[in-house]
């Protein structure tokens, strides 16, 4: 009899195949319903709950109580350990047997004392393979343990993913049984789903699309789910289709297993350790079953955690790394934020990361890997270069809210001209699942068609871990070379970039920062974290400098290398892109603040020890030692301690990177300089402060009505306007609360107005003049501020204390300037850049809120106004108004973010000429690195001493530290950078006993051709604009 005609109506045929593989419909008779065969419950199930994250050896000793499917456990952040005793039926010999496990929370299976696989419903891992084929002599009974964390892949938000965690959330075990798994059914399901994807993805205008649909339809015709003997016929139809290969010009997709794990975010740091174990042990299991599978893993910190907590797993990771399947990438300690960390902190990310990878895996990383961060500094290309990296992968700019970035593969040129090859996976994700839709998008979305014929495809569940699955691998292997689709190969990042480099002649170049047009609120959210970051960067800088000087001058001093490494790693951990940005839950923020407190406490102890060793043995009176940790001479007013806890103001002079003695506190007398500060309060309540350099006038409510550069009489405040104007905005983003501030918030501006008569004189003049006032921001929030002007100081400081209790409000302070310019300048890592002050294009107005470090400046020819700060990052200049972002009040994922008391200082500096010539850079450093008054040992040094100085103000000596390699060898590393944006030759003056000077890279590897000539304790150095140079100084043996 002739076969019935196939009518092949598109919709009915397509839906017929969909129902044949559906997990929801007709599972009693479709193919999906045959995925598992015979099943039986586990023999014995028992459990115990604990609020602790216990090691396996301790957990298995606890008292397990009977449990059953349907039981609830919790609450959030607790752990439920299950003991699962299994008996496999004799009738299952020759079959593949799985433990099927479905529970809320994230599970980890332990077998014979070692972790073997993660189990997470959200990560599509709900079964563990007990045996591929049950043998006649295989044991029928065994005991497993399943450690279930009471949190999901993405935390435990109450009502939404990014909401604050629900502390009372309960979790449930919904399935625990043994079942026979039909691998042949699984492979047929993979093929049918791929054919459906091709049919839908290529569309009705494509011949190959119909071939895919008709092949799938014919497979349904020949496949009887109840008769497995029909499966090979269907499989042959699929193989014939997928065996039809494409042409040589096909785009090649490099598929790399990936598992992005946020080091902390919607869960605490300690849970990340377990997420790593769950995800990576599953990846290793996949490597054993799929020798061609390659998995990329970043973040040295996470590997260090696993090494400490799971040594057996870590040994296996090293084994698979040797095979080339587990590939460490990134080169950094964590995937840090790309905006807020200082330049030196970014260097340390690579220094700690690359040294870890070299020590643990035998080689450094060749690719920088930062798929998920909130922008990318223009100095990153130079920092990468200095750390041996020329390749960079990320994808976050696909989140841009306004403009689509024009490239996926391109060269990125940094501030100094360094270039790196950059690739954004065109599928706009680092968590692909191997679907045809994603494969087609990777090609269709590629903005460099014709210039680059290779793309990355990162597959695996991510953010909260999870990683790849066997199903994803099966899909990608099936699509390796199929007509109508790009070629897919399982590949490593090194293979991808090598392919891109081999055909890079036509790639375009992007110059400057990679600005993310989203998440602008992260420059301001969680102000206490931002302050801790800035303070701890300073503390570690100062400890390293003083410890280095003590090492050079004292044979007995031991440089605290191990302690400093620990403190640096805490700081680098906090610079993870969801911690320093403030986009984390309350628990993480509190842990971060504890890390900062550890750095402050231990750092100050190390500082005192280094200072004591530095000046030991020099004759002089007891008293105070004033230390200057910056590379230029400073003359400043200091508040020095007196007996009884009081303070006395003194004008001190301290040389560059050195110290000066101060007489004992009892003899301190405030000596008036030739030009003291004058303070005058008018009858209307306004106050004028004048130090002969600048004259400051405040209205009776504390607003700045005039700021004059005395020598020229030039007014800095715009006519008819007032500065130091606090403004409040409504701050309700579209979704990402802690992350985003939207452009429309600018439409809600409300000036905060004070009451006349609240301004009062504080310090009445002489060495210092000040005035202070109170301001009620709202019924719930208030601030107090002291406006301070010191002798000889080119800027006026605003010491501010805020009691902040708001919801979805944004506090800023504005300074309208009598300056006109289309560009404003902002400090970034190791330099500065310009951004527009207008909204001409969409690229301009997308930058309505930007980031800066210690200063920003608005200048016209001959004059400018700089706004400095000691712990803020959010900023903007719109027209002629300089605005500093102070506080936000988001409610997710931390409902308490920014609530409470805050202290910070900002300063305003009018200047003649350019900001470079006026010393704005030095002034901002001085604001952030106050002189140190340390108790001098007895006897104290009698004279001043300077260790280093630089002949050019364009060059900043940023860092002095002991060299990392061979601590026994007395070597220092100095890091300098050109800060003005100029070519410059300069002399570095040394007062230390230096034996040899060699140029080195940022990883402190000497340049074979970099030996420098030391003449008269000076080194000549040559810089190009914004260039960072590192020197290795070998010290002479100290006198005994």
From Swiss-Prot:
What does the record give as the active site? 372 (nucleophile)
- Which EC class is the enzyme in? hydrolase
Q: What is this protein called?
A: Alpha-mannosidase 2C1
Q: What does this chain do? A: Cleaves alpha 1,2-, alpha 1,3-, and alpha 1,6-linked mannose residues on cytoplasmic free oligosaccharides generated by N-glycoprotein degradation pathways.
Needed cofactors, names only, are:
Co(2+)
GO biological process: one example: oligosaccharide catabolic process
- Which Gene Ontology cellular component annotation is one that this UniProt entry carries? nucleoplasm
Q: What is the effect of changing residue 871 to S?
A: In CDDG2; uncertain significance; has no effect on processing of free oligosaccharides as shown by complementation assay in MAN2C1-deficient cells
Q: How does its activity get regulated?
A: Strongly inhibited by swainsonine. Also inhibited to a lesser extent by deoxymannojirimycin (DMM).
Q: Organism source for this protein?
A: Homo sapiens (Human)
Q: What disease does the Swiss-Prot or TrEMBL record associate with this chain?
A: Congenital disorder of deglycosylation 2: An autosomal recessive disorder characterized by facial dysmorphism, congenital anomalies such as tongue hamartoma, variable degrees of intellectual disability, and brain anomalies including polymicrogyria, interhemispheric cysts, hypothalamic hamartoma, callosal anomalies, and hypoplasia of brainstem and cerebellar vermis.
Q: Name one GO molecular function term.
A: alpha-mannosidase activity
Q: What is its EC number?
A: 3.2.1.24
Q: InterPro entries this protein is in?
A: Ams1-like_N, Gal_mutarotase_sf_dom, GH38_C, Glyco_hydro/deAcase_b/a-brl, Glyco_hydro_38_C, Glyco_hydro_38_cen, Glyco_hydro_38_cen_sf, Glyco_hydro_38_N
Reaction catalysed by this enzyme: Hydrolysis of terminal, non-reducing alpha-D-mannose residues in alpha-D-mannosides
Look up keyword Hydrolase and say if it applies: yes
Q: Which domain of life is it from?
A: Eukaryota
Query: Per UniProt, where does Co(2+) bind?
Result: 260, 262, 372, 577
Record-linked PANTHER family: ALPHA-MANNOSIDASE 2C1 (PTHR46017:SF1)
Per UniProt, which keywords does this protein have? Answer: Cobalt, Cytoplasm, Glycosidase, Hydrolase, Metal-binding
Record's family?
Belongs to the glycosyl hydrolase 38 family.
Q: Which Pfam families match?
A: Alpha-mann_mid (PF09261), Ams1-like_1st (PF22907), Glyco_hydro38C2 (PF17677), Glyco_hydro_38C (PF07748), Glyco_hydro_38N (PF01074)
Where in or outside the cell is it found? Cytoplasm
């Amino acid at each position: 009899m002739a076969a019935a005609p196939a009518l092949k109506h598109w919709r009915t045929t397509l839906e017929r195949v969909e129902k044949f593989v559906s997990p929801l419909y007709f599972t009693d008779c479709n193919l999906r319903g045959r995925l598992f065969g015979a099943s039986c419950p586990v023999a014995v199930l028992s459990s115990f709950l604990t609020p602790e994250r216990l090691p396996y050896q301790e957990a298995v000793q606890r008292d397990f109580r009977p449990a059953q499917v349907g039981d609830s456990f919790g609450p959030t952040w607790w752990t439920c350990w299950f003991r699962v005793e299994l008996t496999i039926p004799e009738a299952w010999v020759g079959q593949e047997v799985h433990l099927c496990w479905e529970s809320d929370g994230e599970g980890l299976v332990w077998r014979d004392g070692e972790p073997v696989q993660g189990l997470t419903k959200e990560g599509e891992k709900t079964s563990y393979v007990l045996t591929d084929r049950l043998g006649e002599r295989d044991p029928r009974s065994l005991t497993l343990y399943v450690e279930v964390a009471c949190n999901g892949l993405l935390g435990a938000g109450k009502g939404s993913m990014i909401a604050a965690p629900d502390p009372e959330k309960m979790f449930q075990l919904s399935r625990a049984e043994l079942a026979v798994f039909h691998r042949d059914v699984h492979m047929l399901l993979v093929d049918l789903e791929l054919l459906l994807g091709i049919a839908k993805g290529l569309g009705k205008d494509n011949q190959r699309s119909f071939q895919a649909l008709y092949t799938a339809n014919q497979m349904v015709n020949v496949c009887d789910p109840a008769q497995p003997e029909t499966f090979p016929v269907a499989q042959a139809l699929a193989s014939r289709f997928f065996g039809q290969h494409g042409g040589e010009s096909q785009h090649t997709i490099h598929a790399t297993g990936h598992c992005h794990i946020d080091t902390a975010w919607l869960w605490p740091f300690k849970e990340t350790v377990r997420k790593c174990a769950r995800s990576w042990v599953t990846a290793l299991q996949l490597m054993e079953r799929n020798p061609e599978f390659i998995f990329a893993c970043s973040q040295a910190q996470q590997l260090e955690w696993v090494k400490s907590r799971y040594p057996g797993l870590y040994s296996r990771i090293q084994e698979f790394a040797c095979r080339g399947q587990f590939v460490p990438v990134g080169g950094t300690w964590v995937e840090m934020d790309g905006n807020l960390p200082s330049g030196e902190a970014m260097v340390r990310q690579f220094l700690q990361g690359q040294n870890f990878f070299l020590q643990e895996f035998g080689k450094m990383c060749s690719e920088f890997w930062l798929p998920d961060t909130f922008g990318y500094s223009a100095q990153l290309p130079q920092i990468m270069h200095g750390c041996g990296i020329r390749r960079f992968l990320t994808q976050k700019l696909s989140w841009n809210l306004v403009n689509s970035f024009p490239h996926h593969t391109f060269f990125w040129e940094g501030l100094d001209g360094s270039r790196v090859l950059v690739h954004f996976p065109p599928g706009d994700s680092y968590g692909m699942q191997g679907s045809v839709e994603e494969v087609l998008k990777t090609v269709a979305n590629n903005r460099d068609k014709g210039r680059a014929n290779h793309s990355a495809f990162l597959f695996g569940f991510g953010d909260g871990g999870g990683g790849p699955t066997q199903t994803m691998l099966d899909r990608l292997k099936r699509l390796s070379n199929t007509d109508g689709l790009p070629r897919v190969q399982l590949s490593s990042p090194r293979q991808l970039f090598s392919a891109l480099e081999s055909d890079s002649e036509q790639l375009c170049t992007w110059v400057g920062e990679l600005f993310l047009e989203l998440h602008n609120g992260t420059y301001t959210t969680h102000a206490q974290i931002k302050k801790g970051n800035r303070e701890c960067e300073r503390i570690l800088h100062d400890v390293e400098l003083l410890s280095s000087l003590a090492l050079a001058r004292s044979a007995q001093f031991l440089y605290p290398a191990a302690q400093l490494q620990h403190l640096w790693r805490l700081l680098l951990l906090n610079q993870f892109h969801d911690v320093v940005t403030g986009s984390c839950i309350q628990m993480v923020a509190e842990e971060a603040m504890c890390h900062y407190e550890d750095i402050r406490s231990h750092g100050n102890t190390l500082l005192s020890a280094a200072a004591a060793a530095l000046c030991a043995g020099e004759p002089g009176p007891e008293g105070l030692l004033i230390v200057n940790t910056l590379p230029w001479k400073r003359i400043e007013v200091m508040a020095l301690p007196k007996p009884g806890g009081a303070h006395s103001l003194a004008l001190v002079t301290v040389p560059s990177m050195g110290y000066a003695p101060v007489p004992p506190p009892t003899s301190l007398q405030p000596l008036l300089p030739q030009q003291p500060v004058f303070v005058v309060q008018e009858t209307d309540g306004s106050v004028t402060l004048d130090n002969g350099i600048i004259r400051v006038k405040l209205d009776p409510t504390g607003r700045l009505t005039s700021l004059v550069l005395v020598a020229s009489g030039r007014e800095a405040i715009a006519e008819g306007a007032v500065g130091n104007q606090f403004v409040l905005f409504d701050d309700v983003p579209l979704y990402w609360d802690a992350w985003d501030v939207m452009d429309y918030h600018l439409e809600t501006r409300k000036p905060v107005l004070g009451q006349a008569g609240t301004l009062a004189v504080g310090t009445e003049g002489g060495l210092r003049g000040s005035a202070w006032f109170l301001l009620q921001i709202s019924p719930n929030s208030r601030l107090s501020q002291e406006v301070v002007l010191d002798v000889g100081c080119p800027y006026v400081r605003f010491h501010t204390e805020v009691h902040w209790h708001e919801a979805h409000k944004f506090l800023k302070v504005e300074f309208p300037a009598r300056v006109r310019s289309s560009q404003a300048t902002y400090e970034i890592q190791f330099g500065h850049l310009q951004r527009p002050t207008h909204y001409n294009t969409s690229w301009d107005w997308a930058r309505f809120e930007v980031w800066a470090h210690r200063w920003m400046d608005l200048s016209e020819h001959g004059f400018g106004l700089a706004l400095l700060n000691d712990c803020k990052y959010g900023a903007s200049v719109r027209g002629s108004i300089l605005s500093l972002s102070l506080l936000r009040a988001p409610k997710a994922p931390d409902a308490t973010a920014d609530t409470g008391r805050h202290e910070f200082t900002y300063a305003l500096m009018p200047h003649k000429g350019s900001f470079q010539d006026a010393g704005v850079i030095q002034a901002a450093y001085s604001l952030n690195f106050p002189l140190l008054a340390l108790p001098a040992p007895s006897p104290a040094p009698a004279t001043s001493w300077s260790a280093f100085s630089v002949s050019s103000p364009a060059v900043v000596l940023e860092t002095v530290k002991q060299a990392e390699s061979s601590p026994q060898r007395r070597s220092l590393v100095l890091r300098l950078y050109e800060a003005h944006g100029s070519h410059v030759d300069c002399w570095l003056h040394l007062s230390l006993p230096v034996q040899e000077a060699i140029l080195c890279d940022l990883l402190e590897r000497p340049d074979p051709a970099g030996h420098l000539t030391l003449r008269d304790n000076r080194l000549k150095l040559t810089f190009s604009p914004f260039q960072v140079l590192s020197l290795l100084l070998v010290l002479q043996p100290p006198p005994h």
